[in-house]
């Protein structure tokens, strides 16, 4: 096509025409070669996953192999030339742009194809700044309204607020674009004018609701919906002052997920194969067929490129927000899908970007098996950047019928320590997986012509991703971060030229690219965290990098609030580590365990040496730097301000560190205890906000320590909460809460002691599991002998934990009570005599504990408190007299005898699998249970109050529902349990899974819900069902590991089913912490139900009813393996008792459930007699509800005490319980035993199993 224009020099017209043709040829060539590469990738996906193969958590090995083939492809190696050519054409276009603008309108439309196709090229390859430059040039030539909308979105995304203000004044929009303009204006005013934030927040919320309710289905409306949701996701990233204190912000997680969902819908309707929700691998993901028919349509190139880029950025941000908010399962799921989509797009930058994100996340997570994922991703990063990539020859982990050996690693345990731990070798977990030896990292050189060295100087965001890969490869060493810090300025300068072209003003010095800021911030946070974990001091290089990082992440504060807060707090901890160096907190020296065959007690003792005997470090390195008290007080004030202004947002990296740091350094016990509570359950509370789609101060957080104090003081006197928490420096702390006194806070143990505890404990569990699953050719007598040896070692190990891990602080786990007037007066005297050694709350606690502790232990515990501070030496000489006086005044107080008191443990994920309920101090004490979190406890108590229910809860065992062996592979268990179930009027299913609506109805309408099968029943009761249910029934999940919490990393809640039930407001959850044999757990359940519900049916009066915790305690004592079985079963929630019901009746045998054949897979729902109508909980007329104290009402020590077994409910606490990921289920081995049986024989019968394990029987040939 020949173009002439009188107003422009002919030579320039010819150059523009030639450039137009060259750009078209280059972009089409790029699209064709990319399409060839996409076809290769598509064939690899079909080979690895099949046409419709699932993408799940075990897909990383396959994705790593596909990535290595991608990096080795000839088509991939030729992509760099297009980057070089496009860069030259971009420069040429900028020299001719002025002439193109002066052409006639018709000619300008023709020349608009130049920036349009370059815009597509740069969007597709993730070079956003140049893409936006070309987009703005295209708008100047064509005046496309939809392109203007795209430009506004991208300018806001990149943080170019000054340029947005100019464009809003100069651009004219159609009526159809009014909402896009309005959303941008509202967001701009919200960012720049804090006094208008309330008004702008309301306007944005109204616009969001308007867009959501709009039924129009068009590309522009979906783009608007995604954009508005993304804007809303950032609105909570502001400090909450007086004006915003009561505002409801949009929740970040739910809104960024909505933005990603809308962007995915846009891609699915344009290029279906690139949609994250498209799992048909045969669907075309190639871009060329969609461009081939629109080669002359400049508008199409712009919008297809913008749509794909926006989709990638929304998906990436969604994954990062999930990490920030501790949504572990959603994080990994989103990242795996992102890598899959990136590979299908064949975009080098996107593949590297998603691989880096996965590698970064894998380096954070510390659960068993995560080291494999981390290494796979590091290998993939190096392979992508290598000039000579190697095919990853690794296979997917083998599927076996064996029980999953879920371990409980401690946070921060590195791969290098594996040989000194009791975890299985990596090869045991991965089958035939063979990992590559890592290659050396490919350096950038001018002489090299590979893809990496060619693209690095041309693409600033790619350069930042390259530096991130280097940091990941170097395990975030100081050398790699220093290199990144030095290189960042050069990367910024290269990218700044494009940003200046956006403004068309050479005097403008724009801020760094948001993507580069985020990447650098992420790397610095990981590096600082590792420095703190390794106790490294801060040198000059460290402080230089820290200060530079703080400056960089502050360029776009509302987008990087989480990073600003995290980097700031990590810097404070570098400056003031505030380590615990008390006498009982010495780190232990780790030694390799002895590998021994367990044939006798001596063997198990050799394999698991007594806890607490490891040598301890005698001298700790002291910080020689003088302590600046004045500076620290400023730091303390700054932290309080942050807690106050940003307390409404729950960002993991910041919150788990700042609040725990305040908890261990604050001198105010109420502030410290409040901070400890707020440092936990971050992911679960974010999940609650996500479901509610709003974020508000006080919604899932407590607004301050005054509010926390009110909640604690409103607790029943009979209830004590004990939190065992892991601090930011990984030390273990105990926090004790009771309504009558200030919180008690005691550092318990060094991190190395906690590692030793869980290391040895996990080994004992694994050893028992191996005996049960793989007994070999041994007699039944020998089988039980070996298991009893392990059980005996577990018993002594638990004793050792109390003695050496808790020490004298073990008594603090016992419940507290209200002091009488004389005892309270004595506590005040002791507090004053200590001269600062004992706080008043601690003095009250010690007076109360005097009757429960011997004099020596009592004095030792007081001296622990005094060591934490300073005290008068004479005070020690008064301790024997103080103990005698305390015992005397407590003997005058009959509260210990007349009231049953309850201890509820809130345990951090890393120590939650340990059987705390079986500590010797609880041997004669059945009233101990667990709570999911302090927040959930307050929420449960408030729910009881609002529903006018009495504590303990009264349960009608006849009004129950059961699911028995839904997988239909536990035939003997079915026979045993069906016979027992026939005694009751229960409804349920045997050998098949009920429908979701039946499960929801059962949880809502029944008093009790029983699951007897594998794990927690996630296969038949998925999270989606529990999310939509209101659980009024107590839930007994009698599967192995049903309530186990698998820890992941500091600040994460861990994987567990209990959070799903807690989210559904389940009042009580009973389940197993580890694998237990079938016969044993069946007998345990039968004994517990009989003892709590059946055996008490003839009693009258609520005080005479047997509590479930008492029945559980009794069942533990009767278990054949009192620790391996008895200690496995625990309860989360409030106490329950049996409701008075009519005696059991004989039922028509025709209506009883029958055991189905094990091989049958059809529905086995059985007809039952009509169930007892559900009876609502009512307040007993004979025992009135305890009045609730108001905020300003003081409690008198002499007020009337409540009757035994009746807890008073608290005042309203506006908190909600949380949700998190399901723990992986574990198969079990079940023991066959008749329903009514004589004493357990010494020789077991043949056993069925949930896996391939079988207990030896007498019929076996030995």
UniProtKB/Swiss-Prot annotation:
Keywords annotated in UniProt: Cell cycle, Cell division, Chromosome, Chromosome partition, Cytoplasm, Cytoskeleton, Hydrolase, Meiosis, Mitosis, Protease, Thiol protease
Catalyzed reactions: All bonds known to be hydrolyzed by this endopeptidase have arginine in P1 and an acidic residue in P4. P6 is often occupied by an acidic residue or by a hydroxy-amino-acid residue, the phosphorylation of which enhances cleavage
This protein's name: Separin homolog sep-1
Annotated spans, Disordered: 1147-1262
Phenotype reported upon loss of the gene: RNAi-mediated knockdown causes embryonic lethality where embryos are arrested at the onset of meiotic anaphase I. During the first meiotic cell division, homologous chromosome segregation and formation of polar bodies are impaired, and multiple centrosomes accumulate resulting from a failure to undergo cytokinesis. During meiotic anaphase I, impaired cortical granules exocytosis resulting in the formation of a one-layered eggshell instead of the normal three-layered eggshell.
Superkingdom of this protein's organism: Eukaryota
InterPro entries hit by this protein: Peptidase_C50, SEPARIN_core_dom
Disulphide-bonded residues: none
Limits of the Peptidase C50 domain: 957-1051
Organism: Caenorhabditis elegans
């Amino acid at each position: 096509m020949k173009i002439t224009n009188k107003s422009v020099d002919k030579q320039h017209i010819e150059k523009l025409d030639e450039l137009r043709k060259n750009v078209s040829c280059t972009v089409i060539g790029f699209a064709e070669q990319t399409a060839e590469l996409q076809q290769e990738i598509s064939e690899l996906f079909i080979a690895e996953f099949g046409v419709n193969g699932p993408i799940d958590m075990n897909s990383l090995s396959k994705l790593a192999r596909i990535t290595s083939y991608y990096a080795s492809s000839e088509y991939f190696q030729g992509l760099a030339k297009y980057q070089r050519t496009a860069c030259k054409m971009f420069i040429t276009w900028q020299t001719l742009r002025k002439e193109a603008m002066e052409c006639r309108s018709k000619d300008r439309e023709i020349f608009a194809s130049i920036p349009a196709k370059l815009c597509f090229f740069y969007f597709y390859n993730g070079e956003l700044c140049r893409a936006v430059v070309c987009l703005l040039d295209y708008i100047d030539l064509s005046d496309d309204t939809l392109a203007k909308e795209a430009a506004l979105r991208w300018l806001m995304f990149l943080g170019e607020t000054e340029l947005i203000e100019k464009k809003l004044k100069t651009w004219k929009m159609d009526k159809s674009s009014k909402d896009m303009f309005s959303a941008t204006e509202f967001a701009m005013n919200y960012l720049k004018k804090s006094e208008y934030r309330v008004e702008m927040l309301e306007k944005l919320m109204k616009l969001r609701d308007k867009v959501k309710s709009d039924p129009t289905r068009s590309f522009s409306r979906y783009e608007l919906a995604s954009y508005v949701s993304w804007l809303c996701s950032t609105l909570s990233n502001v400090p909450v002052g007086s004006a915003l204190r009561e505002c409801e912000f949009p929740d970040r997680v739910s809104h960024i997920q909505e933005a990603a969902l809308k962007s995915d819908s846009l891609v699915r309707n344009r290029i279906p194969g690139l949609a994250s929700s498209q799992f048909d691998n045969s669907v075309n993901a190639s871009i060329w067929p969609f461009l081939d028919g629109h080669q002359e349509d400049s508008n199409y190139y712009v919008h297809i490129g913008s749509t794909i880029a926006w989709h990638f950025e929304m998906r990436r941000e969604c994954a990062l927000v999930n990490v920030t908010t501790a949504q572990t399962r959603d994080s990994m799921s989103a990242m795996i899908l992102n890598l899959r989509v990136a590979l299908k797009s064949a975009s080098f930058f996107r593949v590297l970007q998603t691989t880096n994100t996965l590698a970064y996340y894998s380096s954070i997570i510390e659960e068993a098996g995560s080291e494999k994922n981390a290494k796979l991703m590091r290998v993939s990063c190096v392979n992508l950047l290598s000039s000579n990539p190697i095919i990853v020859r690794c296979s997917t982990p083998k599927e076996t019928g064996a029980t999953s050996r879920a371990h409980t690693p401690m946070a921060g345990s590195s791969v290098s320590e594996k040989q000194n731990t009791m975890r299985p070798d990596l090869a045991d977990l991965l089958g035939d997986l063979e990992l590559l030896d890592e290659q050396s990292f490919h350096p950038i050189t001018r002489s090299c012509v590979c893809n990496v060295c060619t693209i690095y100087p041309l693409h600033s965001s790619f350069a930042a991703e390259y530096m991130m890969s280097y940091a990941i490869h170097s395990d975030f060493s100081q050398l790699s971060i220093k290199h990144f810090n030095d290189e960042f300025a050069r990367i910024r300068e290269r990218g700044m030229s494009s940003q200046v072209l956006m403004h068309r003003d050479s005097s403008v010095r724009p801020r760094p690219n948001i993507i580069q800021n985020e990447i650098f911030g992420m790397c610095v946070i990981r590096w600082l965290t590792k420095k703190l974990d390794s106790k490294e001091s801060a040198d000059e290089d460290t402080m230089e990098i820290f200060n530079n990082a703080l400056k960089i992440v502050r360029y776009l504060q509302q987008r990087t609030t989480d990073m600003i807060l995290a980097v700031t707090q990590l810097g404070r901890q570098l400056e003031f580590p505030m380590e615990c160096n008390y006498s009982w907190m010495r780190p232990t020296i780790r030694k390799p365990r002895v590998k021994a065959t367990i044939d006798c007690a001596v063997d198990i003792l050799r394999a698991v040496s007594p806890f607490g005997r490891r040598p301890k470090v005698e001298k700790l390195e002291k910080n020689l730097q003088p302590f600046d008290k004045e500076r620290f007080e400023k730091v303390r004030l700054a932290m309080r301000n942050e807690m106050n202004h940003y307390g409404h947002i729950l960002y993991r990296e910041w919150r788990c560190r700042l609040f725990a740091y305040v908890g261990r350094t604050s001198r105010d016990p109420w502030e410290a205890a409040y901070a400890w509570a707020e440092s936990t359950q971050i992911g679960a509370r974010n999940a609650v906000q996500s479901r509610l789609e709003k974020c508000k101060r006080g919604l899932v957080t407590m607004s301050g320590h005054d509010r926390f104090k009110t909640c604690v003081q409103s607790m029943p006197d009979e209830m004590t909460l004990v939190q065992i928490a892991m601090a930011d420096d990984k030390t273990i702390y105990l926090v004790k809460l009771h309504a009558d006194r200030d919180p008690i806070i005691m550092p318990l143990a060094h991190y190395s002691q906690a590692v030793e505890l869980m290391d040895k404990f996990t080994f004992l569990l694994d050893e028992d599991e191996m005996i049960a699953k793989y007994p070999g050719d041994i007699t039944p007598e020998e089988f039980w002998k070996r298991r009893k040896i392990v059980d005996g070692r577990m018993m002594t190990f638990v004793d050792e934990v109390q003695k050496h891990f808790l020490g004298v602080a073990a008594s603090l786990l016992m419940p507290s009570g209200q002091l009488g007037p004389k005892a309270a007066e004595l506590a005040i005297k002791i507090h004053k005599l200590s001269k600062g050694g004992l706080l008043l709350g601690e003095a009250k606690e010690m007076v109360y504990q005097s009757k429960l502790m011997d004099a020596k232990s009592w004095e030792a515990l007081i001296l622990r408190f005094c060591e934490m501070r300073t005290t008068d030496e004479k005070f020690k000489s008064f301790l024997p007299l103080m103990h005698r006086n305390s015992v005397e005044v407590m003997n005058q107080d009959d509260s210990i005898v007349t009231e049953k008191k309850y201890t509820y443990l809130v345990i951090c994920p890393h120590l939650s699998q340990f059987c705390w309920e079986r500590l010797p101090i609880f041997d004669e004490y059945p009233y101990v249970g667990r709570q999911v979190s302090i927040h959930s406890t307050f929420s449960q108590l408030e729910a009881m109050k609002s529903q006018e229910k009495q504590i303990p809860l009264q349960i009608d065992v006849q009004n129950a529902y059961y699911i028995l062996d839904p997988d239909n592979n536990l035939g003997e268990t079915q026979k045993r349990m069906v016979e027992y179930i026939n005694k009751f009027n229960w409804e349920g299913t045997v050998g098949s899974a009920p429908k979701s609506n039946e499960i929801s109805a059962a949880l809502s309408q029944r008093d009790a819900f029983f699951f007897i099968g594998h794990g927690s029943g996630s296969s038949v009761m998925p999270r989606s069902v529990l999310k939509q249910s209101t659980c009024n029934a107590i839930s007994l999940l009698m599967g192995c590991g049903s309530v186990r919490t698998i820890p992941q990393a500091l600040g994460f809640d861990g994987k567990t089913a209990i959070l799903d039930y807690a989210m559904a407001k389940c009042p009580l959850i009973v389940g197993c912490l580890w694998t237990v044999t079938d016969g044993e757990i069946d007998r345990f359940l039968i004994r517990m139900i009989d003892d709590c519900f059946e055996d008490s049916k003839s009693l009258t009066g609520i005080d005479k009813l047997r509590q479930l915790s008492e029945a559980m305690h009794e069942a533990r004592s009767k278990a054949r393996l009192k620790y391996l079985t008895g200690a496995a079963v625990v309860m989360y929630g409030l106490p329950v008792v049996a409701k008075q019901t009519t005696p059991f009746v004989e039922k028509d045998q025709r209506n009883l459930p029958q055991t189905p054949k094990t091989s049958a897979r059809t529905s086995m729902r059985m007809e039952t007699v009509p169930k007892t109508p559900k009876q609502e909980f009512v307040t007993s007329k004979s025992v009135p509800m305890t009045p609730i104290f108001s905020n300003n009402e003081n409690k008198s020590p002499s007020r009337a005490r409540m009757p035994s077994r009746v807890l008073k409910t608290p005042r309203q606490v506006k908190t909600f319980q949380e949700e998190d990921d399901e723990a992986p289920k574990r198969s079990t081995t079940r023991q066959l035993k008749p329903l009514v049986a004589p004493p357990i024989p010494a020789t077991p019968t043949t056993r069925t199993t949930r896996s391939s394990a079988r207990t030896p029987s007498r019929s076996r040939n030995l």
